[in-house]
């Protein structure tokens, strides 16, 4: 199996620590969500940023493969840390909210959003592990 890309991130101190990538493109303090101060981040924000970027790339690709031009997709991904009734530790859930320009119907947009969900590596990694809500809004 061919590896398309590999990266490394190192954390020291857990949720009250620091994380950096091997190339130092990301080099930031980590704090628990309740202590967010705008100068540090948390694992949930990093997950949301990565998943939103990956998913929007997949959505844009699916649209282009299906000859949909000028859709200008935008994806907002909400990550929730919530109680897990089956465990003492919390669990994640995700909402993916996409917006595209009014170049296709709502029905087509929903179909392509689902295709992107099946294609996106983050979606594949989380499949069956977390609840994911998909929403798309076609706007003028």
Curated annotation (Swiss-Prot):
It comes from the Bacteria. SUPFAM superfamilies: OsmC-like. GO terms for biological process: response to oxidative stress. Coiled coil: none annotated. InterPro entries: KH_dom-like_a/b (IPR015946), OHR (IPR019953), OsmC/Ohr_fam (IPR003718), OsmC/Ohrsf (IPR036102). Pfam families: OsmC (PF02566). This is Organic hydroperoxide resistance protein-like. It comes from Staphylococcus aureus (strain MRSA252).
């Amino acid at each position: 199996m061919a590896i398309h890309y590999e990266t490394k991130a190192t954390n020291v101190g857990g949720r009250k620590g620091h994380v950096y990538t091997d190339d130092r493109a990301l080099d930031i303090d980590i704090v628990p969500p309740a202590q967010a101060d705008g100068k540090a981040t948390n694992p949930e924000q990093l997950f949301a940023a990565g998943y939103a970027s990956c998913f929007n790339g997949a959505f844009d690709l699916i649209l282009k493969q299906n000859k949909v031009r000028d859709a200008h997709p935008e994806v907002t991904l909400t990550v929730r840390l919530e109680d897990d009734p089956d465990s003492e530790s919390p669990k994640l859930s995700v909402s993916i909210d996409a917006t595209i320009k009014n170049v296709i119907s709502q029905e087509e947009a929903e179909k392509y959003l689902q295709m992107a969900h099946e294609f996106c590596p983050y979606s594949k990694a989380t499949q069956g592990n977390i609840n994911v809500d998909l929403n798309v809004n076609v706007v003028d």
